[in-house]
């Protein structure tokens, strides 16, 4: 099984992935981790797509955490797609925490430009960070996994 957890930065994707990793004994890939699979990017993309396709058809569980829209094209059709979003102010607050407490204006402008970039993507489950607990989010994904 392949579980794609996608959304903007600082929405809770990694927290969810870590919770699911424990529950499902899954392998987690984040962003461009797949580049380690081969020497060239094209070969790495191809190898990663093959890995995902094999996992989608087999017993192994792979979780792919995506924060760049162009990485969605790597996903196999039959994967579980989980969109994680958060209000812009929450994203900015979390990003500021990661950068020492202050959010530079250019970073805020970048976050504002990118906000909503995943909103129209098809998904099996849409989680809004802060509306439910991380434990409830994990339970919702696990329930979908049992249904697949």
Where are these regions (language model features)?
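Conserved substrate/cofactor phosphate-moiety recognition/catalytic segment
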Residues: 15-57
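Walker A (P-loop) ATP-phosphate-binding motif of ABC ATPase nucleotide-binding domains
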Residues: 2
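Hydrophobic anchor at the beta1->P-loop junction of P-loop NTPases
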Residues: 5
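Loop/turn-to-beta-strand initiation segments
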Residues: 57-63
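Small-molecule kinase domains that catalyze NTP-dependent phosphoryl transfer to phosphate-bearing small molecules
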Residues: 100-148
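Conserved glycine(s) of the Walker
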Residues: 12
């Amino acid at each position: 099984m392949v579980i794609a957890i996608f959304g903007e930065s600082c929405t809770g994707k990694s927290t969810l992935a870590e919770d699911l990793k424990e529950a499902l004994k899954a392998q987690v890939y984040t962003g461009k981790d797949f580049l380690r699979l081969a020497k060239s990017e094209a070969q790495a993309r191809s190898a990663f797509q093959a890995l995902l396709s094999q996992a989608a058809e087999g017993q192994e569980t792979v979780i792919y955490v995506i924060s760049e829209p162009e990485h969605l094209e790597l996903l196999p059709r039959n994967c579980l797609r989980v969109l994680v979003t958060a209000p812009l102010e929450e994203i900015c607050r979390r990003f500021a925490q990661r950068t020492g407490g202050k959010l530079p204006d250019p970073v805020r402008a970048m976050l504002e430009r990118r906000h909503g970039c995943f909103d129209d993507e098809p998904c099996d489950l849409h989680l809004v960070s802060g509306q439910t607990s991380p434990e409830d989010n994990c339970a919702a994904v696990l329930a979908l996994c049992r249904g697949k």
